[in-house]
């Protein structure tokens, strides 16, 4: 009996020692992982070369890409980049007779200045322009290391200053900008105080790469540039990502990062890089119904509900979009890509073409991806002139009878 008790005690002791050993190993590994993650985060900015570094080997692509809306979706605010007018008579937004904001140019920069009951009461410098200007722009201001959205934006469709979307009929200079906002308008922004701290996120002003550059799709390129510069005769690239070789899912995940609607972070912004699985970084709503999806920012979810997409094994965003070129508004070009699948050989050619006009074959888009009013980009006009919603093309490819009817009426003699 004594031997049995001693054996049990020895077994228990061995078990406890073994468990403690594995626990300590796990703690050490976790500590190493956390330290490695911290080091990677601290070194992240150094891993980027900037898009200009790509030009020496890829000049034609670079020269084309810098004209795209992606590349110009954020810029340091200056006279060239701010789309709105600072001319007297064109630089004021009136909320009501007693309250307005004027856009002012001074020797120290550009400012939005609140005037209440005849006195300037608040001002903030315009530091960053968000948006290429094709649809419009909104503006950010630094306050220390914090970023805030300014109350007045610019809307290209009305060629005028407007109240920033979602703002009330009063001036607001205190809407904070977090890293997730910047993740879809910059290539990289270094966070120096995370939202996880319970305080507003802060950023390093000197470690922001403006615009969606080459490295958003091809991954951080500093190591690639260093290697290629030292090995100029090598034709097989190293240390760079080629999205053209991605699986369908990885290709879609890359675009979905910013065109996939609202997602919840489970890892810090900017840790997702090209080639990663989106589900490892975000909580994704896979059940969103198309009736609830806005045309702005939900391109993936709308496309995913389209018959074209659901019946294709290969269709991705790049089936229709060439990210290197500024193709926006080129209806004929996009229609040609539609007809790569929808043609007489496949028996899927548009029946309207055969019965009406030949010119419709150059425009599939207006009937099957019509412009619709955004519920998110709704802006208040100055002087109480009401509100305007921006028109954007839906990515839910379908048959829209009303849009088709309007198109046929408009083009009946063509």
Which functions belong to the PLM regions below?
Residues 18-24, 45-46, 173, 206, ...:
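Secretory-pathway extracellular proteins and peptide precursors enriched for disulfide-bonded cysteines
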Residues 138, 144-146, 150-177, 183, ...:
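Propeptide (latency) domains of metzincin metalloproteases
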């Amino acid at each position: 009996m004594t031997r049995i008790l001693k054996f049990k005690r020895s077994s228990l002791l061995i078990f406890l020692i073994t468990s403690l050993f594995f626990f300590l190993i796990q703690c050490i590994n976790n500590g190493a992982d956390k330290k490695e993650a911290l080091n990677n985060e601290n070194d992240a900015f150094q891993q980027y070369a900037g898009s200009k570094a790509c030009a020496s080997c890829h000049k034609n692509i670079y020269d084309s890409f810098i004209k795209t809306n992606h590349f110009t979706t954020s810029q340091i605010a200056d006279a060239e980049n701010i789309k709105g007018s600072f001319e007297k008579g064109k630089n004021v937004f009136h909320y009501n007779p007693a309250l307005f904001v004027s856009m002012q140019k001074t020797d120290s920069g550009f400012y939005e200045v609140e005037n209440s009951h005849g006195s300037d009461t608040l001002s903030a410098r315009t530091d960053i322009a968000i948006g290429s200007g094709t649809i419009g722009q909104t503006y950010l201001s630094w306050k220390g290391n914090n970023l805030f959205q300014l109350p007045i934006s610019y809307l290209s469709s009305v060629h005028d200053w407007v109240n920033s979307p979602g703002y009330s009929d009063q001036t607001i200079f205190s809407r904070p900008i977090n890293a997730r906002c910047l993740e879809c308008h910059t290539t990289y922004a270094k966070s120096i105080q995370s939202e996880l701290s319970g305080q507003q996120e802060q950023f390093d002003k000197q470690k922001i790469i403006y615009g969606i550059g080459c490295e958003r799709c091809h991954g951080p390129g500093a190591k690639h540039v260093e290697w290629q510069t030292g090995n100029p005769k090598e034709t097989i690239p190293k240390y760079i990502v080629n999205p053209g070789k991605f699986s369908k899912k990885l290709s879609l995940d890359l675009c979905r990062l910013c065109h996939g609607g609202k997602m919840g972070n489970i890892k810090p912004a900017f840790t997702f890089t090209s080639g990663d699985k989106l589900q490892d970084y975000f909580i994704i709503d896979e059940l969103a119904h198309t009736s609830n999806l806005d045309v702005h920012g939900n391109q993936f979810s709308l496309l995913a509900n389209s018959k074209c997409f659901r019946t294709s094994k290969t269709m991705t965003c790049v089936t229709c979009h060439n990210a290197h070129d500024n193709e926006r508004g080129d209806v004929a070009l996009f229609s040609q890509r539609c007809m790569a699948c929808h043609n007489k050989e496949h028996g899927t050619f548009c029946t309207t073409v055969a019965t009406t006009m030949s010119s419709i074959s150059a425009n599939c888009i207006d009937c099957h991806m019509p412009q619709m009013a955004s519920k998110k980009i709704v802006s208040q006009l100055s002087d109480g002139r009401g509100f305007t919603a921006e028109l954007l093309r839906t990515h839910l490819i379908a048959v829209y009878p009303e849009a088709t009817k309007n198109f046929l009426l408009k083009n009946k003699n063509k």
